[in-house]
Regions:
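A short hydrophobic/small-residue beta-strand
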Residues: 94-96
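Substrate-binding/catalytic subdomain of NAD(P)-dependent oxidoreductase enzymes
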Residues: 175-271, 276-278
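ATP-dependent carboxylate/acyl-activation modules
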Residues: 268-323, 329-336
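Rossmann-fold NAD(P)-binding glycine/threonine-rich loop
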Residues: 81-87, 98-138
Length: 400
């Protein structure tokens, strides 16, 4: 029998316990042995709940118990999760986590420590919730050179953009709705400002290039400045605004960005709506492959965590290599990246054409007193210079 411990009994941790219980027969069949939950680490007690008999309040109880082979970390945040996970790995225990903040900040170090101790540190659920993406990048797609990863990797913002598009509501309205439905946190900053998506694309880029990508180096914009007027223009163009996390390999190296983009109806991510996530991977041999599913939620995320538990239970005596060194990757400045841009301004046509040259104007129903136009393909740096020269800019959104 293989003993498991869970650190953190919130939404995801309780979901992991549930999946281990309801699927125990199929898990045992796949592993070749029973997998049983022995401990749950939490600050709280759960009187009247059967889980109470497994509750411990000191992580060292788990670390010092030789029976525990696999530890699940679902606490969130970098500390104390980092200290707890490091202790478990040093004690020779396999660890899986759903904690993107921990993986983005300490992934390379914890992978190296796991290798040194001949155990595994896995993190399938840290990106995309229930969507399998970490394991495919580390195994199925290793014959390819991954040239681009573009994803809708935050369910909160995708739900909000879908609601703004379908109902014509403004940002504050849909945020309140998302919070009421449990899709957005009381403090939604990490989601709506793009920080959550930034950490996820940092993790994926680190896996693809095999080096440490610091999320602080990724240019990040959220959806807080998107307005109903922007949605009207998008609809007039037959496009949808989506918050994308994108990483590309170019002649000089990797560039990454998180920002709203205007997607055409032909784009694979155009129809990804609501709380769903999708990640589009482009390989030099494979071409395009898309991974789609529930990007968040108790059981979808728990399913990804337990998939790691199963993988580790089948490989208790071996480390499965993950190529992600602590050597820092210097990203190419995103300002060198070329895009077309949709711009709204109160300047007149003569000024627009003097500064931007050839543009395509867009007319949106009910919008007056301004111009909307799409530029030719130019670099981010050039666009910024032209914006400053033109002045009177109301909005800028990249066009995919």
């Amino acid at each position: 029998m293989i003993k498991v411990a869970i650190m953190g009994f919130g939404t995801i941790g309780s979901g992991v316990a549930e999946v281990l219980d309801i699927n125990k027969k199929s898990i045992a069949a796949r592993v070749g042995d029973e997998v049983e939950l022995k401990y749950v680490l939490d600050l709280r007690d759960f009187e009247g709940d059967p889980i109470q008999e497994k509750i411990v309040h000191d992580y060292k109880v788990i670390a010092e118990d030789p029976e525990v082979a696999i530890v699940v970390e679902t606490m969130g945040g970098v500390e104390p999760a980092y200290t707890f996970v490091k202790t478990m790995l040093e004690a020779g225990k396999h660890v899986t986590t759903s904690n993107k903040a921990l993986v983005a900040a300490k992934g390379a170090e914890l992978i190296a420590l796991a290798k040194e101790k001949n155990v595994n540190f896995m993190f399938e659920a840290s990106v995309g919730g229930g969507i399998p993406i970490i394991r495919p990048l580390n195994s199925c797609l290793t014959a390819d050179e991954i040239e681009e990863i573009t994803g809708i990797v935050n369910g909160t913002t995708n739900y909000m953009m879908t609601e703004m598009t379908e109902k014509g509501a403004d940002f504050n309205e849909v945020l309140k709705d998302a919070q009421a439905k449990g899709y957005a946190e009381k403090d939604p900053t990490a989601d709506v400002e793009g920080y959550d998506a930034c950490r996820k694309i940092a993790i994926l880029t680190s896996l693809v290039c095999g080096q440490q990508v610091d999320f602080e180096d990724i240019h990040t914009e959220g959806i807080t400045k998107i307005t109903p007027t922007d949605i009207k223009y998008a609809q007039a163009m037959g496009r949808a605004i989506k918050l994308l996390a994108t990483s590309k390999k170019g002649p000089k190296g990797y560039t990454a960005i998180v920002a709203p983009f205007l997607l055409p109806a032909s784009h694979p991510l155009y129809a990804v709506n609501g709380v769903f996530n999708a990640i589009l991977v482009h390989g030099n041999v494979l071409g395009d492959a898309m991974f789609y599913g529930s990007g968040a939620g108790k059981l979808p995320t728990a399913s990804a965590v337990v998939a790691d538990v199963v993988e580790m239970a089948k490989n208790l005596d071996k480390n499965i290599p993950i190529e992600w060194s602590s050597k820092k990757l210097e990203l190419v400045d995103y300002k060198e990246w070329e895009n077309r841009f949709f711009i709204r301004t109160t300047a007149d046509k003569a000024a627009v054409e003097r500064v931007f040259g050839t543009v395509t104007y867009v007319q949106a129903e009910g919008v007056t007193g301004e111009l909307g136009f799409v530029t030719e393909k130019i670099s981010e740096a050039d666009c910024e210079k032209k914006e400053a020269e033109l002045g009177n800019i109301l909005q800028k959104i990249r066009v995919a």
